[in-house]
Structures are given as structure tokens and as C-alpha cells.
């Protein structure tokens, strides 16, 4: 699917309160990916092991989702790409989580817990890397705005994150 990036995207997505099928909770080990998030995009992502995301991939459409994720006992807002990454022509469907506001070293082999609270947009193909990066930054802004509502922000303290 291609999109006209000149069209105005909403600044907030989802209903006022979290509704079914959300929240979706899962956990999995952070594994090595393609190394593109940090190097090419300047937007580091954590790839979740295939076995941990099979259920998610079976029942969720490809696209960009938002919610919270915990790694190393810290909870962060996140955006997650689920799909084939058509710009890169991936052969396997994957789930890649970008922890918003997190800086620091890699955390390969750590267990990440994820709560998905909503859907931002479908997976798209891009003519150039700059448009992809621009859209990811828009996704981050939309996710933060959407999670600023009390029904969503309360999930930052969800019992799923108590370990």
C-alpha cells in the first residue's frame, strides 16, 4: 500500500478508552535483527523472538501499533512495527519495538514485556528512506499523544509489568 504523505494524519488515534481487542500482552526475548534501526534510521528497534510473536502475527494485521514495553525493569512508551517491512523487502514477518525516550546500550537476550494498546496505521512502502523516517517520527508523536489519555496512560503501571 502506498500513501500520500501530504495528507494530514490524525494526531491521536483510537477511542477515548482502550477497547477490545486491546490490550494485547506478550513477552519475548530480544534478538538480533538486521541492524538497520539504529544505523540507517537513527531509530533503534528491538526485535522480538519469532516464537514469542507467533500468536500476534497470526491475529494482527501488519502495521504500526502503540503501547508500553518493559525491559530491564523500566517501562517505556513504544511504537511497534508488525509486518514485512516492504521498503527492505523482508522475507519474514516480524515485530520490531522502538522504545520511545530510551537511550543507552543494546539489551539483546533480555526479556521484553509488551502491552499493545492500539493501532496507528497500516504497513506502507516508501519511495525513499527520508519519507520512511519522517513517517516513523509522526508515528511516535501520534503514539505519545494517544497514550496521554488517562485510560491509556494507566497501563504504564499494569500488573503485567510487576516482576
UniProtKB/Swiss-Prot annotation:
Keywords: ATP-binding, Flavoprotein, FMN, Kinase, Metal-binding, Nucleotide-binding, Transferase, Zinc. GO terms for cellular component: cytosol; mitochondrial inner membrane; mitochondrion; nucleus. The lineage of its organism: Eukaryota, Fungi, Dikarya, Ascomycota, Taphrinomycotina. Monomer. GO terms for biological process: FMN biosynthetic process; riboflavin biosynthetic process; riboflavin metabolic process. PANTHER family: RIBOFLAVIN KINASE, RIBOFLAVIN KINASE/FMN ADENYLYLTRANSFERASE. Belongs to the flavokinase family. Transmembrane segments: none annotated. Its cofactor is Zn(2+). GO terms for molecular function: ATP binding; riboflavin kinase activity; zinc ion binding. The keyword Cell membrane does not apply. This is Riboflavin kinase. The active site is at residue 96. Its EC number is 2.7.1.26.
